[in-house]
């Protein structure tokens, strides 16, 4: 345990994002009951189920909510909302470059965590192809939804159906707060 804490603190000192994890017994919760509790008053949340062999329930169920970052493309404009203490908003007329920037800031070393940790979750709609290929999209947007939305969830809950446990994880990004030990203990 002390080794994990030491690596966490060293990573933050090097300005590298880290993952905090808490393991719980899954004997009284299901992915659906957990999602219903977590997603209250949440605009962005998800439940992903792994599947094996096309129809058999897989090992993992992943839940996420309360995004740190929301990336959205609408009408040729990419926007990124950062939900930190200082709430920032960034707009770009270059959606693909904006996506590359988002991928770059969402990279970090998972260390010895053996459960899946989704970094970017969402969708890239078909209209996104126009930013990558010279193509004429003749269909008009009649339902007025974003061309793409991706989130970086603040809280990720992973049900391991083999080990019968729950891992609750959160990404911790380097900040001005230098009390790294206190951040870990919270």
Short names for language-model regions:
Residues 1-45, 50-89, 126, 130-186:
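Extended accessory regions or peripheral subdomains of proteins
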Residues 92-139:
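Conserved short alpha-helical segments that host acidic/polar catalytic motifs at enzyme active sites
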């Amino acid at each position: 345990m002390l080794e994990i804490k030491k690596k966490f603190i060293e990573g933050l000192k090097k300005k590298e994002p880290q993952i905090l994890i808490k393991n719980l017994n899954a004997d009284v919760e299901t992915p659906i009951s957990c999602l219903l509790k977590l997603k209250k008053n949440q605009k962005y949340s998800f439940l992903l189920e792994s599947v094996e062999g096309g129809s058999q329930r897989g090992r993992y169920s992943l839940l996420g909510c309360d995004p740190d970052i929301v990336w959205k493309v609408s009408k040729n404009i990419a926007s990124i909302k950062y939900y930190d203490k200082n709430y920032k908003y960034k707009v770009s007329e270059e959606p693909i470059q904006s996506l590359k920037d988002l991928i770059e800031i969402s990279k970090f070393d998972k260390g010895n965590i053996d459960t899946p940790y989704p970094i970017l979750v969402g969708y890239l709609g078909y209209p996104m192809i126009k930013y990558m290929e010279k193509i004429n999209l003749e269909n008009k947007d009649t339902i007025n939804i974003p061309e793409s939305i991706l989130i970086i969830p603040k809280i990720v809950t992973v049900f391991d159906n083999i080990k019968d446990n729950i891992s609750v994880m959160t990404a911790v990004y380097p900040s001005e707060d230098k009390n790294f030990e206190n951040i870990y203990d919270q």
